[in-house]
Amino acid sequence: METIVKESKGKQEPKECCPLFHPEKWDKKTFNWDHKKFIKASVPTLFHMPFPPLLGKKITKMMKMAEDSNNLDSDKEEILLLFADPSPFKSELYLSVTAKVPNAENTDLSGTFISKVFDGAYKAIPKFINQMDDYLKQQNKKANNYYVHYAYCPKCAKKEGHNYMVLFAEVGK
């Protein structure tokens, strides 16, 4: 886990970045979510590629809203930030929370989700979706929707030497 030192009124305080990711916890698992709570936001994309400054600001704002209302899971390994692209020009972000967050777009997800962990570049997502489709076929399942959770921010992915992502396939309501 990376520790970033942050200056605060002349003192140095450690600030945790991304928690260490354990692929075995998420790989080839089935999750049954019954109104799992999230806050939702969206960012513009250009053919599924988000604009980094806008994305960073949006994620920071979502995290701050959840933290300020004490509705972010205290176990950072349990926090999910899911991405779904309803079009090539828009990405929706879903941050898991423990309760409703004031002044945020609160939503929930329900259904059966099958997850699989991949390690590779962002541009490999279409290939990973094809691999996930093959995996689901072996189980006589078909994805209705896909959500992607990136285990590390770009800085931590570089430090850890892995760009893990969890593909969540919604297979039933």
What are these regions (language model features)?
Residues 1-173:
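A solvent-exposed interaction/effector surface
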